[in-house]
């Protein structure tokens, strides 16, 4: 478990590399992409919190696996997901569209459609004094999501949307993939000093059993080859190359 004091966001490590984010305000909590339920219930009970909502970025089982047990345990919980996911996230009770704005825990949260990994992936953007983006599997530190249902064009466009956000946006992705991503990037750009520095930083955090996420958009744009891609052709080459990386 890791706690971001400035944002009141807690990360629970689960499965092999998933991270479930819990956004806490006063005694209320919002859970983002609960892949499992047991550690979430434990944390909520131990801290006497009230589950208010679950945010679902997409339908993959390692993001929704814990949702049903959570809404069976607590009543009147909002399950917020894309309106395009009604069949694949059938327990959603708040269906949202791209560009829609919600009030969650007293904060304005904007829905941003980020297609590519799936055909209906969304992100949740808190545009406050300390901007936050819950991005699911669209962007990782040093990488981006595999393209399962969408197209290269959709993923490239999604990353361009992310790049247009405030540069001090703190990005919360759903997997701890950073070291592998940086090693891949260094294989392509072995002399890149920003990547070398990032690898040292990542290895230090991991040696202390700390997460390497979340990450700042401004810093990520310097080291993420997908965000640095100048056009669709370059992005397509990088994504195809990364798919072959072992």
UniProtKB/Swiss-Prot annotation:
Residues the entry annotates as binding Zn(2+) 2: 62-63, 137, 175
Keyword Zinc applies: yes
Reactions performed catalytically: an S-(2-hydroxyacyl)glutathione + H2O = a 2-hydroxy carboxylate + glutathione + H(+)
Entries under InterPro entries matching the protein: Clx_II_MBL, Glyoxalase_II_hydrolase, HAGH_C, Hydroxyacylglutathione_Hdrlase, Metallo-B-lactamas, RibonucZ/Hydroxyglut_hydro
Key words of the record: Hydrolase, Metal-binding, Zinc
Pathway(s) this gene product operates in, as recorded in its UniProt entry: Secondary metabolite metabolism; methylglyoxal degradation; (R)-lactate from methylglyoxal: step 2/2
SUPFAM superfamilies listed in its UniProt record: Metallo-hydrolase/oxidoreductase
One MF annotation (Gene Ontology) recorded for this entry: metal ion binding
Cofactor-binding details, from the entry: Binds 2 Zn(2+) ions per subunit.
Residues involved in Zn(2+) 1 binding: 58, 60, 117, 137
Pfam families attached to this UniProt entry: HAGH_C (PF16123), Lactamase_B (PF00753)
Subunit field text: Monomer.
Record-given protein name: Hydroxyacylglutathione hydrolase
Organism: Prochlorococcus marinus (strain MIT 9301)
Organism phylogeny: Bacteria, Bacillati, Cyanobacteriota, Cyanophyceae, Synechococcales
Name of the gene encoding the protein in the UniProt record: gloB
